[in-house]
């Protein structure tokens, strides 16, 4: 009688463990499926930059380029555009953010995106220089990094490539923020991946 009770209890425990494993595994599969259906805009706008800020100047520019690619090549709602501009402004240094208030920045992005659309220009690909090509300097006690990026554009049946240099400054928390950026000429030092 005791042996039968122990066998039944053991079978019940094994069934409970198997059932728990199935439930946990099924929930994680569902969570993974939900993640897979997020658009690039949603992946960027749901990224918590307060907890997961990019660690290097290169990663900051890569994230900014993902945002730029969304601006000029994807469909988004006005609320998503607000969220995209919020994320971009979090990457900006205080000086750049002060010179680009959210409403002004959003209007500029909207006008540029419309201009690209009117001219049938698409941003086909972006690239950022290798980690070894990032230049670091110290200026008036501030750590500064220079990161080159490339933009492969398609207009009708023709293609062009432009280059920009991003200047980033490390803030008091150690985060790299975009201080400014400008168009540069292509040369052998500008090759990006």
Task: Give the label of every model feature segment.
Residues 109-155:
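Surface-exposed, charged secondary-structure patches
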Residues 40-120:
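Core segments of small alpha/beta cavity-forming domains
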Residues 1-42, 193:
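Amphipathic, hydrophobic N-terminal targeting peptides for secretion and organelle import
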Residues 46, 144-156, 161-169:
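Extracytosolic low-complexity repeat regions of secreted or lipid-anchored proteins
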């Amino acid at each position: 009688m005791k042996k039968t009770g122990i066998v039944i209890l053991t079978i019940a425990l094994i069934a409970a463990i198997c059932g728990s494993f199935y439930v946990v595994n099924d929930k994680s599969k569902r969570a993974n499926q939900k993640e897979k259906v997020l658009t690039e805009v949603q992946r960027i706008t749901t990224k918590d930059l307060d907890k997961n800020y990019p660690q290097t100047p290169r990663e900051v520019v890569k994230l900014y380029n993902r945002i730029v690619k969304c601006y000029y090549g994807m469909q988004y709602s006005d609320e998503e555009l607000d969220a995209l501009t919020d994320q971009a402004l979090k990457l900006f240094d205080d000086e750049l953010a002060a010179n680009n208030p959210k409403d002004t920045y959003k209007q500029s992005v909207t006008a540029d995106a419309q201009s690209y659309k009117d001219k049938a220009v698409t941003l086909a690909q972006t690239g950022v220089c290798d980690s070894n090509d990032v230049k670091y300097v110290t200026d008036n006690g501030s750590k500064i990094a220079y990161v080159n990026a490339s933009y492969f554009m398609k207009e009708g049946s023709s293609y062009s490539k432009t280059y920009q240099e991003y200047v980033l400054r490390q803030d008091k928390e150690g985060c790299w923020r975009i201080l400014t950026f400008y168009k540069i000429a292509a040369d052998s030092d500008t090759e990006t991946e």
